[in-house]
Amino acid sequence: IYLCRYQQTSKFDSMKRQFILTCICLLFTFVGTQGKTTSIPTIYIDGNGVMRWSDTHREASFFGANYTTPFAHAYRALGYLGVDRKAAIDKDVYHLSRLGFNAYRIHLWDVELTDGEGNLSENDHLDLMDYLIAKLKERNIHIVITAQTNFGNGYPERNEPTGGFSYKYDKCSMHSEPEAIAAQERYLYSLVRHTNPYTGLAYKDDPSIVGFEINNEPCHSGTKEEVKAYINRMLKAIRKAGNRKPVFYNVSHNEWTVEAYYDTDIKGTTYQWYPIGLVSGQTQQGNFLPYVDRYDISFADKVKGFDKKARMIYEFDPADIMYSYMY
């Protein structure tokens, strides 16, 4: 763009005009830099339950790991060793990338992120989570956040009192107690809107965050209508926060109420997969590749709308063998 033209008349005029020109050039450089954004495609779920990229509309598929350094025992263990947690995150994310992972999932320990009313706490756990997200973004690793666990932070040690709302309720009453539901609404609303200081983006606006799962392995004890009402209240709180990302729900627990899950507006469903079992108590021998050839879901042909939801395995582990080939 042709901005200006000037003719030198005196040394003073020349210096003045040169200064003005310099300011104009700097201004346009600054504006150009600030206005430049890297377009990162987001994820949407089509009418057939397939995750797709927003730019190419091709299917999006992911393989990754759970990793919990910001929370609970992993957090404490690094403290015992005197290890800088952010330095550990730097190294671990590097190795996750070397493994070829393009995805990361975590269930947040809400007991370490909230007060007794469900208000989000600005603390070291949240700061480390924000830092971890920023480092994952640098490696082009996409993220699914499971917002809450609704159990303590102790295992394999004793729980530590934190004042978090989940400590006030039994896990199986979390989804029916009015005060507990209100606390979860408050927490989800604040979490989704939380701005990560390392990225400058709210979780709801970060394209590297694929979506949110409402909770980890819920324990529903009520009727199907009560289960549906609970999920709809959580969805409403997340929408109110401005979220447009897909929301997932665990459908591999409480299978007797599975119809209620699919009768809500969740966009994705989550499952465990231990292809050769979990508790044999010994190392099993043999060729187990046929066990990962298929993943059969018992209610796949029984529930209306099953094929309209995306599917995510949040735990995959051939736990009773010592071989790596199952991956």
PLM feature segments, named:
Residues 22-29:
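Bacterial N-terminal signal peptides
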Residues 1-14:
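Short, Lys/Arg-enriched N-terminal segments with co-localized hydrophobic residues
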Residues 240, 244-320:
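Glycoside hydrolase catalytic-domain groove-lining segments
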Residues 40-266:
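Active-site mouth of glycoside hydrolases
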Residues 33-37:
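Boundary at the C-terminal end of the N-terminal hydrophobic targeting segment
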Residues 327:
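Aromatic- and carboxylate-lined catalytic core of secreted/periplasmic carbohydrate-active enzymes
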Residues 322-324:
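Solvent-exposed loop/turn segments connecting transmembrane beta-strands
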